[in-house]
Amino acid sequence: MTQMPQTNARVHAGRMAYHAGLSAEASVIREYESHGYVFEAQRWRGQVGEIDLVLRKSGLVVFVEVKKSKSFERAALRISPTQKRRIFATGEEFVAQEPQGLLTDMRFDVALVDAAGAVQILENALSEG
């Protein structure tokens, strides 16, 4: 049995994580759509950072940070204070393009995906305060 060189192993692990993330995001999109939300953007990139998902419902813009891990608990622990600040700043950058600008109704959710692919939505989980 041959071993992959360490750099190839890292590339492989990175690709696996990337595709697992896309799969988790697709599951989360389906969950939101089943509740009447309209998908707008995936991995929206601003100057400050990236928002995993942007959805809309009745004038509300919902920004979703998707976290995948073996369990919901482990996934929830993967959001750092720095990442939270970046998500808020990027969300504000997104709504600045909206007709109402920063007065746009918005919410910051976290979507957790476990190893079995189950999805748990935590509405307003990243609220400031």
From Swiss-Prot:
GO molecular function: nucleic acid binding
InterPro entries: Restrct_endonuc-II-like, tRNA_endonuc-like_dom_sf, UPF0102_YraN-like
Signal peptide region: none
Organism superkingdom: Bacteria
UniProt record similarity statement: Belongs to the UPF0102 family.
Protein name: UPF0102 protein RD1_1191
Organism this protein belongs to: Roseobacter denitrificans (strain ATCC 33942 / OCh 114)
